[in-house]
Curated annotation (Swiss-Prot):
It comes from Shewanella piezotolerans (strain WP3 / JCM 13877). One of its GO terms (molecular function) is ATP binding. Its EC number is 2.7.11.33, 2.7.4.28. This is Putative phosphoenolpyruvate synthase regulatory protein. The keyword Kinase applies.
Length: 270
């Protein structure tokens, strides 16, 4: 039986999940996880406590409870359960209060809530990424913070959306297709924004596997076509002095981090 894990918060529970995943990923085990957001009342907290206690009775093992709860009275109810508590916020707040010489002023939903102009900036960045995905339009490239380039299925769209959602970066992306390969060059709209260009590449074998799952036994997915496209695009990156990273076997989080590290783009945290 898998060890039970609870991610609990009086907000979205995103912080608790991220913290918990980071810790649990250090162990080569699988877990049975349950996320419970918006535990904003004592009544809800008592219900969650009952779930945790029932789990302990059923399994005979104390559940792992990762939480980021602002309200002390709700936090105390979770503390009184049979779970093993890992309190992300309170672990660090008290030492910081001492160092900063002032008490914390807890507020619900401050971390991932709709509280200020930064929220609107994030929505604007997400809308921009969707409107400028896959070369749909070249009219607004001058408004981009970043323009990702690459062959089809190398990770441009998920990387653009992740950068916009997590960091408020206006990321457009442009694909190089089979039709471009005979005379591969940058379109004028990209040339005018060359300082914003960043390339993605991928191992041809992995690209072949991805394309096969989408359009099997086609020219588009053939090993020969994949090798040719990757080779031509990488040669163009080098010719035009466009920085690029290899996305093979990397998660979208890792790809985004590599891009940010290479470009020194400012992260807009929310």
């Amino acid at each position: 039986m898998l060890r039970k894990v609870f991610y609990i918060s009086d907000g979205t529970a995103i912080t608790a999940e991220v913290f918990g995943h980071a810790v649990l990923s250090q162990f080569p085990l699988e877990f049975d996880a349950l996320t419970i957001p918006f535990v904003e009342t004592e009544k809800k907290a008592e219900a969650v406590k009952a779930q945790i206690n029932d789990c302990f009775i059923t399994t005979g093992e104390r559940p792992l409870v990762f939480h980021s709860i602002v309200k002390a009275e709700i936090r105390d109810i979770i503390y009184s359960s049979e779970g093993l508590d890992y309190d992300f916020l309170n672990t660090f707040v008290a030492p910081l209060e001492k160092q900063l010489g002032m008490p914390a002023t807890p507020a619900l939903h401050r971390t991932h809530g709709k509280t200020n102009d930064s929220y609107e900036a994030r929505i604007e960045a997400i809308n921009y990424a969707m409107e400028n995905d896959d070369g749909q339009t070249m009219k607004h490239m001058d408004k981009a913070d970043l323009i990702l380039l690459g062959v089809s299925r190398c990770g441009k769209t998920p990387s653009s959306l992740y950068l916009s959602m997590q960091f408020g970066i206006k990321a457009a992306n442009y694909p190089f297709t089979e039709d471009d390969m005979d005379n591969l060059k940058l379109p004028d709209a990209l040339k005018r924004n060359k300082d914003k260009l960043f390339g993605l590449t991928i191992d041809p074998v992995r690209l072949h596997e991805i394309r096969q799952s989408r359009m099997s036994n086609s020219r588009y997915s053939s090993m020969r076509q994949c090798r040719m496209e990757v080779k031509e695009v990488e040669m163009m990156y080098k010719r035009e002095r466009i920085p690029f990273v290899n996305t093979t076997n990397h998660s979208v989080e890792e790809i985004a981090t590599k891009i940010l590290e290479a470009t020194s783009l400012e992260r807009h945290m929310f």
